[in-house]
Amino acid sequence: MAIMPYIRQGTVINALVILFSFWAFLSLIRVIRRRSSTTPLKGPPSESFIFGLRQIIHKSEDSDALYEQWADKYGSVYQVSEPMGSKRVVLCDPKAILHLYSKDTFDFVQTEINRLFLGKYFGRGILWAEGESHRRQRKALTPAFSNVAIRNITPVFFDSAYKTKAAWDATFESNPTKERIIIEVQTWMNHISLDSIGIAGFSHDFGSIQGKPSAVLDVFDSFSNVQPDATTTLMFTLAATFPIMLNIPNNRNALFTKLHQTILEISDELLESTRKEEEGKAGGGRGDAKSIIGSLIKAESANSHLRISQEEVIAQMNVLLLAGYETTSVSLTWALIELSRHPDVQQKLRDELSRFAATDPTWEELTNGLPYLDAVVHEILRLHAPLDETIRVAANDDVIPLGTPLQTASGNIVDRISIGKGTTVSIPTRCMNRLTGLWGDNAKEFVPDRWLNDEKDLLKANEIQGYRHLLTFIDGPRTCLGKGFAIAEFKAVLSVLIRHYTFEFPDGPETKVVGHRSIMERPKVAGQDGAKVPLLVRRVE
């Protein structure tokens, strides 16, 4: 009898070996098929069969520069090694990028691991959806992000900025002998973004600017304090090949689970309260299409041809709350950093805004009447895009045209490449925004003036077909639905802060700023504990 456990153990081991061998065989067949259908491309040598070049990219202080170096050496389209011997095609050719984005959600879809991650932690909303499901959800949300809707909610952005001003002024008044005080600005930008998306999107004031406790803000802040350890990094590296590893407990997964639960509770509460309010109005339950939550309720109506399920409604709220908080706060923080580094630019912007001493710019003026504010904002979006790359998988065999002929690994010169079904293809979006070949020798520098003169100074960047020749909001069917919302908030808040305060680094403009891993990469002053950016702030007389 004592031998039975060993027999059972041996049986389990044999079964695992057989399963792994079967997986390896199927994977080999898929790899052979993909490679036989894909044009052989040049690329940097692999550092490891298990990790490919993932660790090199992950550990690099400037992965965008790494992608650019490889493009210079191997051509505007090349391949890099991925974990477990797989390959990824990298597109740095504008024509090829346009082709991929034009076929997004149908012929090029998200990776399996991305969809599993999004579905698990944020629900089956617009970020998760593909094809017709994505098209339907996007149409349902579009009214909430029209120009009319954004014009109506722009006062919310100004209100958040003035609440922050009131808090800062109170600090000055409690320190009457100090003309300048140190303020950790990133925390305040987080509060502005959270309160703005709460009020403008969901008619809910989180009150974070006034210091009101918020469960969702606590979770957001936790991501900045808990950095991924070696185990977590290994798990995410291999999860693309073994998606089941996404379920392994670790500190980051625990935070995403907590974030999901917290936002879910808030979304349920906000949705229920809005439904009750709408029931008392004429045509109860149909909502106000000018608000995000109103559009969601309208789309949930059984009579709507764009009907979305309650699960999808909650998922949209999860994604919009996260996106509205994270991306804008990062961009605002980077704006204050660059303006602190460049006091001449800061003063030029203040001079342009000086005519609004007694009133605020209208939405129309923010959009078209303040060219230098527009230039500063778009230079920040170019130089410091919140997302670093777009990764897709070919759902079918495809042929991608090239703007610049390319020499393949076999020595042939081609003006298009074949991509086999199942091939992973990526676009290094932040790298493209800074590519010297597109933006000139000063591509890595903060130069708002490049956006003036009808954008004639953009050189070859005009070949990029995305919004304002940037890939910050990507392009095609998945182009960021909330870009108008984000830009209006960015401009409104920045216009208030620059009119009333000056900003500089306590240790001078050469202060080193590094990346800090959070939900998205955030800036932080080197040496700070957490994603902190302390600046010396003075009131403008």
UniProtKB/Swiss-Prot annotation:
The pathway is:
Secondary metabolite biosynthesis; terpenoid biosynthesis
Please verify whether the record's keywords include ATP-binding: no
Alphabetic keyword roster: Heme, Iron, Membrane, Metal-binding, Monooxygenase, Oxidoreductase, Transmembrane, Transmembrane helix
Report TM segments: 12-32
Q: Does the keyword Metal-binding apply?
A: yes
**How does the UniProt record describe the way this protein sits in the membrane?**
Single-pass membrane protein
Record's GO cellular component terms: membrane
Q: Which SUPFAM superfamilies match?
A: Cytochrome P450
E.C. designation(s): 1.-.-.-
Q: Where does heme bind?
A: C480
What the entry lists under InterPro entries is as follows: Cyt_P450, Cyt_P450_E_grp-I, Cyt_P450_sf, Cytochrome_P450_monoxygenase
Its annotated compartments are: Membrane
Task: Select a single GO molecular function from the record's annotations and give it.
Answer: iron ion binding
Which protein family is named in the record? Belongs to the cytochrome P450 family.
Q: What is this protein called?
A: Cytochrome P450 monooxygenase claW
Organism for this UniProt entry:
Ampulloclitocybe clavipes
